[in-house]
């Protein structure tokens, strides 16, 4: 296929048009008075959002050269979202500022490679300074503030802070759509897995259709149980103790299941059978997790263990087990705390080493089930459009909070970037490298300018005053006041601010060193789009009648 080429100034200008188109659409959402963007969807109602990365991913431009520029900035937003989960609009604003400022200098004869080195050195110093003014997040109130700033909603901030307090920083917090209007928090204590009872006759509470076992023994095996004789010896030992039994096996069927149900209905013995969660290797790992949590031993032929010779010592215990049609929850398993914490450390190490996002997510879920529990934030709204928008905001807030817990927080509202302006300006560089550093200095002011601009005021006045204020004092665009940002609860996670700056600088440096751009030539759509050749002369077919 034939290609179109553009060189030097032409190439960069064409790509800059794309950068500006995308960034201008994204940056209107920045700050407490930022607006929303409406995205057309082929099916269903349009999506209304203020999430930078969601907007950036939707934008594709007709001109191939402009589209390349737009996609470069879109990558800044995506990368920041992958690393920190929020700050995508800030990253886009920073990238646009660095690219525009850098392009002016390259056009007037500066060397792009020197500029690139200057940008990299200035950003490295800026990141160090950000870490220097960062404060750790320890209180529930600080967590609530970060989530509230990200979502623009104090109620969401409190919900996320409560969820993290209940399930711990390692806990799984999922976001689901609610059937009602209200947004609420639901916490599942203990370990829950998605397998229910093998037979509805096993329920103990007919109204709720659930089986509740108080202080039960727990048998864990990876075998199918079809013959009751296999488990009879261990069943007799449990009956003597007068306690209920939870059986977790690959499957319980046929005569074994029938015997358990009959004994339950007669009131002789209370046992609930549940299929093992997961599949393949993940199933083995999950059974091992349950065993560690309850102090049981997984009875598996891999270890040379047999059900017939199993004893009551190999069973686990828990204070309570609740089994519904779809889920089983084990509360307060009586496993050894040291064994549990070493298992948690092992899973955490696996998660850090894993390169697959899917595996990471599954390991994180297992970690949460062992370490604390699972919290579900059910998002409610009046319409589907509002629900989608609210759900996106809460997801951003949750990511932002996690990033904050990891690396601490800095004054929000773009203040931290201006706070480090003086230290970065003291960096002594020569020639084009000094030009690169000045590009970063100008970009550090841009998020504040944009937040103020979105609030309907002049950014330059605020930025100049902010440079003279001491660290932490900033402009609250929501109330039009100068406040101590941390005390006012306007904070950003250090990780989010740092990632936004690093990713923006990376793409800007690449952009400025671009000297040629190659794109596919647009196809000429001629007439009937390559149909069949002239079909004249077929009129004579009448003679075939």
Curated annotation (Swiss-Prot):
Pfam family, one: Cpn60_TCP1
Catalytic EC class: isomerase
GO molecular function: ATP binding; ATP-dependent protein folding chaperone; isomerase activity; unfolded protein binding
This protein's record includes keyword Chaperone: yes
Residues binding ATP, per UniProt: 29-32, 86-90, 413, 476-478, 492
InterPro entries (UniProt xref): Cpn60/GroEL (IPR001844), Cpn60/GroEL/TCP-1 (IPR002423), GroEL-like_apical_dom_sf (IPR027409), GROEL-like_equatorial_sf (IPR027413), TCP-1-like_intermed_sf (IPR027410)
Gene3D superfamilies: GroEL, GroEL-like equatorial domain, TCP-1-like chaperonin intermediate domain
Catalytic activity, reaction form: ATP + H2O + a folded polypeptide = ADP + phosphate + an unfolded polypeptide
EC nos: 5.6.1.7
Biological process per Gene Ontology, one example term: protein refolding
Entry's localization field: Cytoplasm
A Gene Ontology cellular-component term: cytoplasm
CDD domains: GroEL
Keywords, sorted A to Z: ATP-binding, Chaperone, Cytoplasm, Isomerase, Nucleotide-binding
SUPFAM superfamilies, per database record: GroEL apical domain-like, GroEL equatorial domain-like, GroEL-intermediate domain like
Quaternary data: Forms a cylinder of 14 subunits composed of two heptameric rings stacked back-to-back. Interacts with the co-chaperonin GroES.
Family note: Belongs to the chaperonin (HSP60) family.
Role, per record: Together with its co-chaperonin GroES, plays an essential role in assisting protein folding. The GroEL-GroES system forms a nano-cage that allows encapsulation of the non-native substrate proteins and provides a physical environment optimized to promote and accelerate protein folding.
Protein name from the UniProt record: Chaperonin GroEL
Gene: groEL
